[in-house]
Amino acid sequence: MPAAADTQADRASRPAALAADAGEASAVPQPAEAPECSSPVAVFEAGVEVGRVCPADAPRDGLTLIDLSDDWVPGALREPDDAVHLPQPYRSAYVKLANEEFPAGLEGERPRRDAFLDLYGIFPSLQVVAARLLDEERHACHAAVDASAIQTLATSPQPSTAQVTPAVTAAFAALDRLLVCERLLPASTRRRPRWRLQEALEAYQRKHMIVSYGVLDRETRRALEQDTRELDFRALLRTLRARVIDAAGLIEDGTARAVRGTILSRQIDGDAFHAGDGHEPMEEGAPDLVSPATEAAARALGWTDPAAAAEFFLRHGPAPTRRLTVAVRLPPAPAYHDEHMDLRVEIDRGDVWYELPARRGRVAHHPTLTLYARTSGDEEVALVRWPTTIGGWKKELGPKGKLGLRYKNSDVGKRLWRDLIVSPAWLPPLETPPRALVHRLSAAGKWIPDTDLLGPGYASAYGLVMLVHHRAVEGADGTVWYDNGIRTHGSLSYHSILESESHGCHRLFNHAAVQLASFLLRHRNHLTRGLMARPFVHEFTWRGTKLKLPIPQRGYRFELTPPVEVEVLPGTVRGKIQRVPLRIVKLPRPQAHASDAAAKVAPPLPPEGSEVQAAPPKQSG
């Protein structure tokens, strides 16, 4: 971001506001007797500490322990407490990013540009959200801006490309002032380049979980019209929800019934996460358990509205969540929850079109991933039904080095999830176009290898979590595990998920992939295999220069025992072409498309060829 340095300096000073009314901490009722254990946990009801409980006794008393600490990570990113396995490679980075501590140099160039990682599966720590809630200077700045020109727009203009009209100019001027309030732009009386306004708008959208091409669409205009304290409160509820999901071992979010609930009468996610998939609600679908549990936790802590939440942080003094675990009463978990659950997965490919993109028809039924659990009564419950992706036409280098289009298919049939890889690395196949492996430094204007794409990290082509699709075949010497390169994995290419296309893999929103992995490790027997320390270097040539992409390790592996059964259904093949096209075809002439303009200014997403695994790259060294 152009104002990244100023932004980080401003944020670093905000937690001091938490000390404003620290003297009121004595008003919190204290129990007469502390339980006999070394680390008793505070029990909260209706915003008041009503007692303390030993962690071991909490389940007996119907209480759930929720870790609100600033060094929290999801279950999938934790390692066993032993001296055998190396630490998870991405854990410390995750904690720093959640606290908006962005690395210096090239390592931090991507997160500094993204500014807010809420949209990409790394929810801010409570310290960060509390500082936002208590930032009265920012709230007052927003309230003083007349944003009526934004709300009266008849179109959804994009700052970097929009045709200049009086209405658009007035709207962009108001937007500029609001983004200065957000400290995403420096205050300036000079005329600002429109690409800077574009970058700042995209960062604002990421902050509020808005999936957009960086345009002033209706959803963004609604957010800009909202009170900033309300938006910060929704961010607080999203962070709390992640902690509740982890603490209670939940995943059931209502998607199997096509109904996501609200929390304190609020829809706290962007519209894209409530979009329909064209499928009917499932009779065997689990109800939304996540939203009621999150609301129960919020009410227990007294976080019922922005003012009440702000008062909580003021009352508890500076850095209240540096180390904080609380005990609250949540709705009971379903009876089918267990340490080892009988689970299976079904991936419905939905409507499949093999025609070239320009000739493809409408996708009415989008691909979905459904996780089932078998109950003690031998019935099945659909826990979630999430949007995912299947194959499509993607760019690839042909045999003579020319760029063309090839259809990347998603395998159909029964597979197994055995290997669950956290913070995975992506190994570029030989046919990956070089342009997909570089990005341009905005400051220096030079091309450098895109190490973020390889991982580990939220911007990896595989996201934060990957599950390998294996086909097990029994041979004379035991089981042979065939890997055709298909994975279920996280991604920050959210537009591809909404448009249902990938390079053959089944993509999930980054935060959903983390939830899935954490649920599997919580409710499925597994072995911790640990760090996959197999270094690799990918060499390629870009514009006459030889470049190297080092891959120091390939992720942190867990082995599910037994593996989870996965069935990929064929879906419904539409159009005249009924079989998978095998040949590579010439690139069609470029056509104007809304996403083309956005791609010029949006942060780089996992590029073309990100899942091609037809031939493993040659090892170096």
Regions picked out by a protein language model, each given a short descriptive name:
Residues 2-621:
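N-terminal pre-domains immediately preceding structured catalytic cores
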